[in-house]
Every structure is written in C-alpha cells, then in structure tokens.
C-alpha cells in the first residue's frame, strides 16, 4: 500500500498556489438604449468619467459628455450605423489623446490624427491629450518678437507678435483664408511650424489650400488638420483641439508655431448640434451656455513661454465668419473678447478691388505693437495717421465740390497710400520691402504718379533696390532700425528709379 506523506502533498499544494496566476479585470460596461444622429444613450457605465472614451461592440469610439442619473449621453466619433440597440459598451479608462511627432510635418490628417492624404501611416512614439490645460501666468512672458504676415496693411498697422491671438473676421468670400495662407507662405525660412485646421469646409476648398501650399514649398513646415462638411459633428468639434495639441508639442520643444482655425463659427455650430441632441438647455442663438468656454479654453493655449520653459511660442489666428457684417452676433463678440485684437475684412472693400480687404479703421492689435521692429515703427506711425485723416476727408469730400489745394493734395496722397496697401494673393513681402514701400508713399514720392502707375512703379522699385542698393536691406536686417545711412540709400534708390520710370512712361 502506497504511503501518502502529508509534507509532500502540502509542498505540491504550496507550489501550485505560488504558480497560480489569475488576473482579474474589472470592466465598466453598459447597454445601448438608443442611438441616432451621432448620439447614443447608454444604461450602466456607472463609474464613467466626463470626457472618457467608450468603445462600442462593433469598434466605434465615443465620448461620454452627459452624465445623467439614469443614463449616459455619448457622442460618436463615427457614423455609428452598425451600433445596435441593446449591444454592450465598455469604458476604456482613457480620455481623448493623439500621437505626436515631427513626422506629421507635410501631412494632412483628421481630428483623430489619422492620415487622410493616402501617403501611409505616420510613426509616433509620444502622445498628447487633445484637451490639455493652458500655460499659467508664471509660465508665460509678454509678446516681444514679431510674426510677419507678409501683408503690408497688417505688419505696419495691426502687427502680430509671436504668442498672440489675432482674430480674422469678415463675411463669406472676403479673403479670410487668403490672409491666413499668405501668413503661412511668409513663414518660409523663419523657422516657424504652421498648423492649418479646416473645420466643416468643402473638401475642394481644403484641397485647394493644400495644393497652393505644396506648389510653394510651404507643406514642408505645415500640418493640415481637416474635418470637412460631411464629417460627424463630434470630429468637427474636436479638430481645433487636435491642431492645438500638435502645435503645443512643438511649442514645448522650444520652437515657434502658428496655428490657424478656419473657422470657429463652424466649430460652434457643430457643438450646438451636439448639445441640442444631448438635450442640453439652449441659450442665445440656441448655442449652449458653455460655448464661450469652448473657445476660451482653446485660444488660451496660445502663448509665449517663459525662458525657463524654453521661450517657445504658439500664435493663433482664429477665423470667424459674420453674417452681412454683423460683428455684434454671439460668436463674433465672444471670440473678439478672448483674442488680443482683430483684423476685420470688409465685403465692400473687397468688391471695390481693395485686396486684402482690411478695414484699418476698426481692426486693432492689442499687444502686437510691442513686437514691431523699430524700423517699421518709424515709418508706420505716419501711414496710420495719414490714412485716418484720408478716411475722414473722403467722407466730407463727397458733399463739397470746391476743395482747396491742400485738401486735394491730401486726398491724392491718401488714394496712393491705399493703392500701396493692395497686394496680390500668395505674394507676401519681406519686412525690408514693406518699409521701403511705406516710406515711398508717406514721403510723397508717389504723388506725381497716376494711381494706375503706383503698383507697377513699386514692383520695379523693389527689384531695383534689391540689385542696386543691397546695403539698405543689409542695414535693416542687421540693426532692425531705419538708420540715417539706410535712409540715404533708400532716398537715392527711389530718386533714381523714379527718374527711370518717368522716362520710360514718356517713351
């Protein structure tokens, strides 16, 4: 008979217990009560967090936005056509985040940071939360470096600094996107990473922007985040935050970034749609009560970081569309109060052929003047004053026919100044070219020319100065000041070119 030894049995049991490895996973699940219009109502999910990602049985991801006593309101990040009533949903324990890396440069992606340009996957080792807190007061420093847009009207009178938020506002078809894309083109060689976020636009418009950036070599330093008009409202609402997360990644790595949100009116409409479907109480213009917070938490992420954090910056150019020039509507007033100034584009000026159609009278930059270079300040003050006086005189001149000589001269000067502010699309000017152009206008060199000759003369003058007076550009770029020496080079160049030009015109 086999003897059973108790110590052997206990050793075997002990070994088995030590080797026993059963992992227990607790999954927070729920059941779909109702689904439709990009919204799902879920029963269960007791411990879900606000903003947490949830996963449906067939793979769709959603965000839990409404936590109510008996159900959870989830917005879907997809069409949700395969989700069935009664199917299960599980909480993931994560909140929305995207992968980030240098590899995103030159690519077109969607709000979930997936490439949509057909050029394969993007490799990334790091990730960032889509919604992350803005830098605090101690983490920032005041704006002091200029961000040149390449547009004379903006860089001289409504200057933008790195780390500023400047709103571009105007009716549809007034050139808002053109101002933004020209600014991206002007960052070539300036070591600025650009992020262009297209929200709720036609796919053809986005393709046009991407093509124009590619043709001019600007996609090398640009990321395009696009959620077109046929995208679910949830993704249109998320797209700006995705763009901000990508720009922040570069900002915290001591680089300068420029982000364009085109446009925030469409994001607000997508958010309104989501909120109404979630049965949140509507407020003014049927927008939910927290629509201000929607934009403020986005735009506050733009900053100029302190020297301890590496002095990186994120400059935001949000775009807002108005209806027949009504700046006092809900979304425009909200965004105006959040930003550090606005560039107002007028349909009347646009139709009158003044492009970019910037209404200098009501456009302001609240912090940009600190970022202007000294040379620009020296010439821009006079331009601003003369244009303001011209606008006033022009209104009076409509009523009186007999004007004295001084008034006639002032009107003629104003018309020529307005002419020199006109620029073709995708033709940004360097700051030296802008200074030279403004100086020519404010010092009366254009007064003897016909209005139709002004632009031709200025184009020839820029070429002439570049080839024959390169010292002018060298002095401005090295000292950032219009020194007496630079001024004398400039005067000589203008005089010589003016004589040549008038001689050509006579022939």
From Swiss-Prot:
Binding-site residues for ATP, renumbered to this chain: 170-177
Enzyme Commission number(s): 7.1.2.2
GO MF annotation list: ADP binding; ATP binding; proton-transporting ATP synthase activity, rotational mechanism
Topology in the lipid bilayer: Peripheral membrane protein
Catalytic activity: ATP + H2O + 4 H(+)(in) = ADP + phosphate + 5 H(+)(out)
Disulfide bonds: none
Annotated site, Required for activity, chain positions: 363
SUPFAM superfamilies hit by this protein: C-terminal domain of alpha and beta subunits of F1 ATP synthase (SSF47917), N-terminal domain of alpha and beta subunits of F1 ATP synthase (SSF50615), P-loop containing nucleoside triphosphate hydrolases (SSF52540)
Localization annotation: Plastid, Chloroplast thylakoid membrane
Key words of the record: ATP synthesis, ATP-binding, CF(1), Chloroplast, Hydrogen ion transport, Ion transport, Membrane, Nucleotide-binding, Phosphoprotein, Plastid, Thylakoid, Translocase, Transport
Residues modified as Phosphothreonine: 257
Keyword Iron-sulfur: no
One GO CC term, this protein: chloroplast thylakoid membrane
InterPro entries given in the database record: ATP_synth_asu-like_sf, ATP_synth_asu_C, ATP_synth_asu_C_sf, ATP_synth_F1_a_nt-bd_dom, ATP_synth_F1_asu, ATPase_a/bsu_AS, ATPase_F1/V1/A1_a/bsu_N, ATPase_F1/V1/A1_a/bsu_N_sf
HAMAP family xref list: ATP_synth_alpha_bact
Family listed: Belongs to the ATPase alpha/beta chains family.
Subunit structure comment from the entry: F-type ATPases have 2 components, CF(1) - the catalytic core - and CF(0) - the membrane proton channel. CF(1) has five subunits: alpha(3), beta(3), gamma(1), delta(1), epsilon(1). CF(0) has four main subunits: a, b, b' and c.
Function of the protein: Produces ATP from ADP in the presence of a proton gradient across the membrane. The alpha chain is a regulatory subunit.
Name of the molecule in the record: ATP synthase subunit alpha, chloroplastic
Species in which this protein is naturally found: Lobularia maritima (Sweet alyssum)
